[in-house]
């Protein structure tokens, strides 16, 4: 900075010359007007108002003037800097508003465009029903048990009182694993899970065992070589056929609502006495029986639909698991999950549930039960 100059001549300090100051202001205003972005305007601010700008240097030269001249020079420089700062502020607001509008325009969503959504997934109807069945029985205090799908001959047949001459052991009914002589097969029911449980757990036992089972069946509208079952087992003191009937009735109501059931005498090697469980036809409600004018394809005009099997556990099964039959008794039941889903949704063909046709799955998604 220059020292005080008592013989001050304004011409000698060019930075303080009025024309020079006006020229610097004009340059700054022109640069401000040319700035098209806030980033460019920031650079203009540094160039024309920063510490090394012409106006800043002129402001520092005021100290070199005699006291009498400092007031006019300070006023002139202050007014010049004020004009530049005011122009910077106005231009900053203009550019900021313009940039905001541009960003909003770029980010605007056209609400008239169709919504692009991802395909909605949902549990398979069979999986959903298995979960539903498990919820029903766990709410009653039962447990869910699982076991291997490939079983030994003893677990799948012998322990369940199916003798060596039972037709279920034949190649045309059971899927035996190579080598056949090893006595390994794909389980034909989930009953082996009950044997595994009884060998590991002493009564009282209350379990259900849902899962896949395998049969050498034809693949048609009512049969599948791989399908799903849920079996239940209750072993405790004083268990009777009455307990079985009450449990199966409660299960039927949970699945189908206020439906009538019928217990029809039958034979199963692992239960004695045994029964088939029938449900009153959901379509004709028995009105087609003996009425040729109103035939029902669902129940074949019989008024009832077969649902599953049940019975009091054969003492031989309990003895094979080391359970004292003088103290304990039990009941068992088994129903097809696939058939239950079929009944609940009035589906005519079991194959629709396993062929992976998305159109069929979507048709059930809204009203599948």
Swiss-Prot record:
GO molecular function: ATP binding; magnesium ion binding; phenylalanine-tRNA ligase activity; tRNA binding
Reaction catalysed by this enzyme: tRNA(Phe) + L-phenylalanine + ATP = L-phenylalanyl-tRNA(Phe) + AMP + diphosphate + H(+)
UniProt-annotated binding residues for Mg(2+): 272
This protein's record includes keyword Signal: no
Cofactor(s), names only, from the UniProt record: Mg(2+)
GO CC annotations, alphabetized: cytoplasm
Co-factor: note: Binds 2 magnesium ions per tetramer.
Annotated Pfam families: Phe_tRNA-synt_N (PF02912), tRNA-synt_2d (PF01409)
Localization annotation: Cytoplasm
Keyword Cytoplasm: yes
Alphabetically ordered keywords of this record: Aminoacyl-tRNA synthetase, ATP-binding, Cytoplasm, Ligase, Magnesium, Metal-binding, Nucleotide-binding, Protein biosynthesis
HAMAP family (UniProt xref): Phe_tRNA_synth_alpha1
Protein name in the entry: Phenylalanine--tRNA ligase alpha subunit
Source organism: Cutibacterium acnes (strain DSM 16379 / KPA171202) (Propionibacterium acnes)
